[in-house]
Amino acid sequence: MKTLKEKNKHPRLRKTIRTKKVTQRKLSSSPVCLLCLQEPGDPEKLGEFLQKDNLCVHYFCLILSSRLPQKGQPNRGLHGFMPEDIKREAVRASKKICFVCKKKGAAIRCQNDQCVQNFHLPCGQERGCLSQFFGEYKSYCRKHRPTQNIHQGSLGEESCVLCCENLSRTSVENIQSPCCSQAIYHRKCIQKYAHTSAKHFFKCPQCNNREEFPQEMLRMGIHIPDRDAAWELEPGAFSELYQRYRHCDAPICLYEQGRDSFEDEGRWRLILCATCGSHGTHRDCSSLRPNSKKWECNECLPASTTS
Protein backbone atom coordinates (compact mmCIF):
# COMPACT_ATOMS: atom_id res chain seq x y z
CA MET A 1 0.00 0.00 0.00
CA LYS A 2 1.28 3.45 -0.93
CA THR A 3 2.11 5.90 1.81
CA LEU A 4 0.60 9.40 1.95
CA LYS A 5 3.91 10.82 0.76
CA GLU A 6 3.93 8.51 -2.28
CA LYS A 7 0.36 9.46 -3.20
CA ASN A 8 1.15 13.15 -3.11
CA LYS A 9 3.90 12.60 -5.65
CA HIS A 10 1.36 11.76 -8.35
CA PRO A 11 -1.62 14.16 -8.04
CA ARG A 12 -2.08 14.35 -11.83
CA LEU A 13 -2.19 10.59 -12.18
CA ARG A 14 -4.86 10.29 -9.52
CA LYS A 15 -6.93 13.05 -11.09
CA THR A 16 -6.70 11.45 -14.53
CA ILE A 17 -7.95 8.14 -13.19
CA ARG A 18 -10.96 9.72 -11.48
CA THR A 19 -11.98 11.93 -14.39
CA LYS A 20 -14.49 10.51 -16.87
CA LYS A 21 -13.36 10.34 -20.44
CA VAL A 22 -14.80 13.22 -22.45
CA THR A 23 -14.49 13.36 -26.22
CA GLN A 24 -14.57 16.42 -28.43
CA ARG A 25 -16.72 16.58 -31.55
CA LYS A 26 -14.89 16.16 -34.83
CA LEU A 27 -14.66 19.33 -36.86
CA SER A 28 -16.91 19.40 -39.92
CA SER A 29 -16.09 20.93 -43.29
CA SER A 30 -19.66 22.28 -43.45
CA PRO A 31 -20.83 25.22 -41.30
CA VAL A 32 -21.96 24.09 -37.86
CA CYS A 33 -23.98 25.70 -35.09
CA LEU A 34 -21.79 27.36 -32.48
CA LEU A 35 -24.10 26.21 -29.68
CA CYS A 36 -24.66 22.55 -30.55
CA LEU A 37 -21.76 21.94 -32.96
CA GLN A 38 -24.00 20.27 -35.52
CA GLU A 39 -24.91 21.04 -39.14
CA PRO A 40 -28.13 22.85 -40.22
CA GLY A 41 -30.43 19.81 -40.10
CA ASP A 42 -34.24 19.92 -40.11
CA PRO A 43 -35.64 23.46 -39.57
CA GLU A 44 -38.79 21.99 -38.01
CA LYS A 45 -36.65 20.49 -35.24
CA LEU A 46 -33.81 22.99 -34.94
CA GLY A 47 -35.22 26.18 -36.41
CA GLU A 48 -33.72 28.35 -39.12
CA PHE A 49 -29.96 28.06 -39.55
CA LEU A 50 -28.75 31.63 -39.10
CA GLN A 51 -25.45 32.91 -40.50
CA LYS A 52 -23.90 36.32 -40.01
CA ASP A 53 -20.26 37.04 -40.75
CA ASN A 54 -18.47 33.95 -39.37
CA LEU A 55 -21.19 33.17 -36.85
CA CYS A 56 -23.55 30.22 -37.48
CA VAL A 57 -26.27 29.06 -35.11
CA HIS A 58 -29.67 27.36 -35.07
CA TYR A 59 -32.51 29.68 -34.10
CA PHE A 60 -33.84 27.19 -31.54
CA CYS A 61 -30.38 26.87 -29.96
CA LEU A 62 -30.38 30.65 -29.52
CA ILE A 63 -33.70 30.92 -27.75
CA LEU A 64 -33.28 27.75 -25.66
CA SER A 65 -29.71 28.24 -24.41
CA SER A 66 -29.81 28.46 -20.62
CA ARG A 67 -27.69 31.57 -20.08
CA LEU A 68 -27.98 33.52 -23.32
CA PRO A 69 -29.63 36.96 -22.91
CA GLN A 70 -31.53 38.71 -25.70
CA LYS A 71 -30.34 42.28 -25.26
CA GLY A 72 -30.94 43.81 -28.69
CA GLN A 73 -33.93 44.73 -30.79
CA PRO A 74 -35.21 42.03 -33.20
CA ASN A 75 -33.42 43.74 -36.11
CA ARG A 76 -30.03 43.70 -34.37
CA GLY A 77 -27.57 40.83 -34.24
CA LEU A 78 -29.35 37.51 -34.79
CA HIS A 79 -32.99 38.15 -33.86
CA GLY A 80 -31.84 40.38 -31.00
CA PHE A 81 -29.08 38.08 -29.75
CA MET A 82 -25.78 39.92 -29.94
CA PRO A 83 -22.71 38.15 -31.41
CA GLU A 84 -20.55 38.80 -28.35
CA ASP A 85 -23.21 37.27 -26.07
CA ILE A 86 -23.54 34.22 -28.34
CA LYS A 87 -19.78 33.65 -28.28
CA ARG A 88 -19.72 34.08 -24.50
CA GLU A 89 -22.48 31.47 -24.17
CA ALA A 90 -20.52 29.11 -26.41
CA VAL A 91 -17.51 29.44 -24.11
CA ARG A 92 -19.70 28.63 -21.10
CA ALA A 93 -21.24 25.65 -22.90
CA SER A 94 -17.80 24.35 -23.86
CA LYS A 95 -17.34 23.38 -20.21
CA LYS A 96 -20.65 21.50 -20.01
CA ILE A 97 -20.92 17.85 -20.99
CA CYS A 98 -23.98 16.51 -22.82
CA PHE A 99 -25.47 13.62 -20.85
CA VAL A 100 -26.49 11.96 -24.14
CA CYS A 101 -23.37 12.00 -26.34
CA LYS A 102 -20.86 12.67 -23.50
CA LYS A 103 -19.30 15.48 -25.52
CA LYS A 104 -18.72 19.09 -24.56
CA GLY A 105 -20.65 22.14 -25.75
CA ALA A 106 -24.02 21.45 -24.10
CA ALA A 107 -25.72 24.85 -23.83
CA ILE A 108 -29.10 23.65 -22.51
CA ARG A 109 -29.80 22.53 -18.94
CA CYS A 110 -32.88 20.84 -17.51
CA GLN A 111 -34.94 23.47 -15.67
CA ASN A 112 -35.78 21.18 -12.76
CA ASP A 113 -34.00 22.65 -9.72
CA GLN A 114 -32.76 19.25 -8.58
CA CYS A 115 -31.48 18.18 -12.01
CA VAL A 116 -27.98 18.79 -13.38
CA GLN A 117 -28.46 17.31 -16.85
CA ASN A 118 -27.02 19.35 -19.74
CA PHE A 119 -27.55 18.50 -23.39
CA HIS A 120 -27.21 19.63 -26.98
CA LEU A 121 -30.60 20.38 -28.52
CA PRO A 122 -30.41 17.63 -31.21
CA CYS A 123 -29.17 15.08 -28.64
CA GLY A 124 -31.94 15.97 -26.21
CA GLN A 125 -34.60 15.59 -28.89
CA GLU A 126 -33.34 12.10 -29.67
CA ARG A 127 -33.46 11.14 -25.98
CA GLY A 128 -36.96 12.46 -25.24
CA CYS A 129 -36.07 15.85 -23.75
CA LEU A 130 -38.65 18.62 -24.21
CA SER A 131 -38.31 22.35 -24.84
CA GLN A 132 -41.09 24.93 -24.56
CA PHE A 133 -41.32 27.80 -27.04
CA PHE A 134 -43.07 30.41 -24.92
CA GLY A 135 -42.53 32.41 -21.74
CA GLU A 136 -39.10 31.59 -20.32
CA TYR A 137 -38.35 29.00 -23.04
CA LYS A 138 -37.66 26.21 -20.56
CA SER A 139 -36.17 22.82 -21.38
CA TYR A 140 -36.47 19.54 -19.49
CA CYS A 141 -34.82 16.15 -19.57
CA ARG A 142 -37.00 13.10 -20.17
CA LYS A 143 -37.40 12.43 -16.44
CA HIS A 144 -38.71 15.92 -15.58
CA ARG A 145 -40.54 16.92 -18.77
CA PRO A 146 -44.29 17.73 -18.80
CA THR A 147 -46.41 14.65 -19.43
CA GLN A 148 -49.93 13.67 -20.48
CA ASN A 149 -52.07 10.85 -19.20
CA ILE A 150 -52.27 8.86 -22.43
CA HIS A 151 -53.77 5.38 -22.07
CA GLN A 152 -50.86 3.07 -22.85
CA GLY A 153 -53.11 0.29 -24.16
CA SER A 154 -54.15 2.37 -27.17
CA LEU A 155 -50.60 3.07 -28.34
CA GLY A 156 -49.64 0.95 -31.32
CA GLU A 157 -53.27 0.01 -31.90
CA GLU A 158 -54.90 3.31 -32.82
CA SER A 159 -53.71 5.58 -35.60
CA CYS A 160 -52.56 9.20 -35.73
CA VAL A 161 -55.43 11.47 -36.76
CA LEU A 162 -53.19 13.38 -39.17
CA CYS A 163 -51.19 10.70 -41.00
CA CYS A 164 -53.48 7.70 -40.29
CA GLU A 165 -50.48 5.51 -39.40
CA ASN A 166 -50.15 3.54 -36.17
CA LEU A 167 -49.15 5.46 -33.05
CA SER A 168 -45.72 4.89 -31.59
CA ARG A 169 -45.51 2.73 -28.48
CA THR A 170 -43.15 5.32 -27.02
CA SER A 171 -45.49 7.77 -25.32
CA VAL A 172 -43.14 10.77 -25.63
CA GLU A 173 -43.54 10.56 -29.41
CA ASN A 174 -47.33 11.03 -29.17
CA ILE A 175 -49.50 13.97 -28.10
CA GLN A 176 -53.13 13.84 -27.02
CA SER A 177 -55.64 16.56 -27.86
CA PRO A 178 -56.98 18.39 -24.78
CA CYS A 179 -60.35 19.13 -26.38
CA CYS A 180 -60.90 15.87 -28.28
CA SER A 181 -59.55 13.30 -25.82
CA GLN A 182 -59.84 10.40 -28.26
CA ALA A 183 -57.56 12.13 -30.76
CA ILE A 184 -53.87 11.25 -30.45
CA TYR A 185 -51.18 12.49 -32.82
CA HIS A 186 -47.57 11.77 -33.61
CA ARG A 187 -45.47 14.60 -32.23
CA LYS A 188 -43.73 14.97 -35.60
CA CYS A 189 -47.10 15.27 -37.38
CA ILE A 190 -48.36 18.00 -35.05
CA GLN A 191 -45.07 19.87 -35.38
CA LYS A 192 -45.26 19.72 -39.17
CA TYR A 193 -48.87 20.94 -39.02
CA ALA A 194 -47.89 23.82 -36.71
CA HIS A 195 -44.94 24.75 -38.90
CA THR A 196 -47.21 24.97 -41.95
CA SER A 197 -50.30 26.63 -40.46
CA ALA A 198 -48.41 28.90 -38.01
CA LYS A 199 -49.98 30.92 -35.20
CA HIS A 200 -52.96 32.42 -37.02
CA PHE A 201 -54.26 29.14 -38.50
CA PHE A 202 -53.19 26.58 -35.88
CA LYS A 203 -56.22 24.89 -34.33
CA CYS A 204 -57.54 21.46 -33.35
CA PRO A 205 -57.86 19.38 -36.54
CA GLN A 206 -60.98 17.77 -35.08
CA CYS A 207 -63.09 20.54 -33.55
CA ASN A 208 -61.26 23.74 -34.63
CA ASN A 209 -60.54 24.75 -31.01
CA ARG A 210 -58.21 27.78 -31.11
CA GLU A 211 -57.57 28.32 -27.39
CA GLU A 212 -57.14 25.17 -25.32
CA PHE A 213 -55.55 23.16 -28.13
CA PRO A 214 -52.68 25.58 -28.98
CA GLN A 215 -51.96 26.16 -25.27
CA GLU A 216 -51.59 22.44 -24.59
CA MET A 217 -49.43 21.96 -27.67
CA LEU A 218 -47.13 24.75 -26.47
CA ARG A 219 -46.90 23.13 -23.04
CA MET A 220 -45.94 19.86 -24.69
CA GLY A 221 -43.10 21.44 -26.65
CA ILE A 222 -44.63 22.19 -30.05
CA HIS A 223 -43.16 25.24 -31.76
CA ILE A 224 -45.88 27.41 -33.32
CA PRO A 225 -44.26 30.08 -35.54
CA ASP A 226 -45.57 33.62 -35.12
CA ARG A 227 -45.98 34.38 -38.83
CA ASP A 228 -48.37 33.91 -41.72
CA ALA A 229 -49.19 30.39 -42.84
CA ALA A 230 -46.68 28.77 -45.18
CA TRP A 231 -49.11 28.82 -48.09
CA GLU A 232 -49.52 32.59 -47.75
CA LEU A 233 -45.77 33.17 -47.91
CA GLU A 234 -45.36 31.35 -51.23
CA PRO A 235 -45.47 33.82 -54.16
CA GLY A 236 -48.42 33.16 -56.43
CA ALA A 237 -49.67 30.27 -54.31
CA PHE A 238 -53.29 31.14 -55.13
CA SER A 239 -52.78 32.59 -58.60
CA GLU A 240 -54.98 29.94 -60.20
CA LEU A 241 -57.93 31.14 -58.10
CA TYR A 242 -57.79 34.50 -59.83
CA GLN A 243 -58.00 32.98 -63.30
CA ARG A 244 -61.43 32.77 -64.91
CA TYR A 245 -62.48 29.34 -66.16
CA ARG A 246 -61.99 29.16 -69.93
CA HIS A 247 -63.32 25.80 -71.21
CA CYS A 248 -66.57 24.51 -72.70
CA ASP A 249 -67.76 21.37 -70.87
CA ALA A 250 -70.85 20.63 -73.00
CA PRO A 251 -71.12 16.95 -74.07
CA ILE A 252 -70.72 18.09 -77.68
CA CYS A 253 -68.93 21.35 -78.42
CA LEU A 254 -70.19 22.97 -81.63
CA TYR A 255 -67.64 25.79 -81.85
CA GLU A 256 -65.33 25.18 -84.81
CA GLN A 257 -62.34 26.72 -82.97
CA GLY A 258 -62.63 24.25 -80.11
CA ARG A 259 -63.55 24.06 -76.44
CA ASP A 260 -60.81 26.43 -75.24
CA SER A 261 -61.87 29.30 -77.51
CA PHE A 262 -64.83 31.65 -77.15
CA GLU A 263 -66.13 35.11 -78.07
CA ASP A 264 -67.09 38.02 -75.85
CA GLU A 265 -70.70 38.11 -77.08
CA GLY A 266 -73.14 36.13 -79.20
CA ARG A 267 -73.62 32.43 -79.78
CA TRP A 268 -70.08 31.52 -78.70
CA ARG A 269 -69.90 33.48 -75.50
CA LEU A 270 -68.70 31.27 -72.62
CA ILE A 271 -71.22 31.07 -69.77
CA LEU A 272 -69.92 29.79 -66.42
CA CYS A 273 -71.94 27.77 -63.93
CA ALA A 274 -73.81 30.21 -61.69
CA THR A 275 -73.23 27.97 -58.64
CA CYS A 276 -69.64 26.70 -58.76
CA GLY A 277 -68.03 28.79 -61.50
CA SER A 278 -65.72 25.89 -62.36
CA HIS A 279 -67.62 24.58 -65.40
CA GLY A 280 -68.59 26.41 -68.57
CA THR A 281 -70.42 26.15 -71.87
CA HIS A 282 -70.84 28.10 -75.09
CA ARG A 283 -74.40 29.44 -75.41
CA ASP A 284 -75.15 27.35 -78.50
CA CYS A 285 -73.53 24.20 -77.10
CA SER A 286 -76.18 24.04 -74.35
CA SER A 287 -79.03 25.56 -76.42
CA LEU A 288 -79.19 28.68 -74.26
CA ARG A 289 -81.22 31.71 -75.34
CA PRO A 290 -79.31 34.56 -77.04
CA ASN A 291 -79.57 36.83 -73.99
CA SER A 292 -79.16 34.13 -71.36
CA LYS A 293 -76.42 34.81 -68.81
CA LYS A 294 -77.28 32.10 -66.28
CA TRP A 295 -76.56 28.39 -66.53
CA GLU A 296 -75.81 25.56 -64.11
CA CYS A 297 -73.65 22.51 -64.72
CA ASN A 298 -74.92 18.95 -64.23
CA GLU A 299 -73.11 18.65 -60.87
CA CYS A 300 -74.78 21.70 -59.36
CA LEU A 301 -78.21 21.40 -61.01
CA PRO A 302 -79.52 18.57 -58.75
CA ALA A 303 -78.48 20.47 -55.61
CA SER A 304 -80.16 23.69 -56.69
CA THR A 305 -83.33 21.79 -57.67
CA THR A 306 -83.49 20.08 -54.26
CA SER A 307 -83.01 23.30 -52.36
Curated annotation (Swiss-Prot):
Expressed in Leydig cells and in developing spermatids (at protein level). Highly expressed in Sertoli cells in testis. Its EC number is 2.3.2.27. Zn(2+) 4 binds at residues 160, 163, 186, 189. Residues 67-92 are annotated as: Required for interaction and ubiquitination of the nucleosome core particle. Pfam families: zf-HC5HC2H. Zn(2+) 1 binds at residues 33, 36, 58, 61. It is found in: Nucleus. PANTHER family: PHD FINGER PROTEIN (PTHR12420), PHD FINGER PROTEIN 7 (PTHR12420:SF47). The extended PHD (ePHD) domain is required for interaction with the nucleosome core particle via binding to DNA. The C-terminal PHD domain is required for histone H3 substrate binding. This is E3 ubiquitin-protein ligase PHF7. It comes from Mus musculus (Mouse).
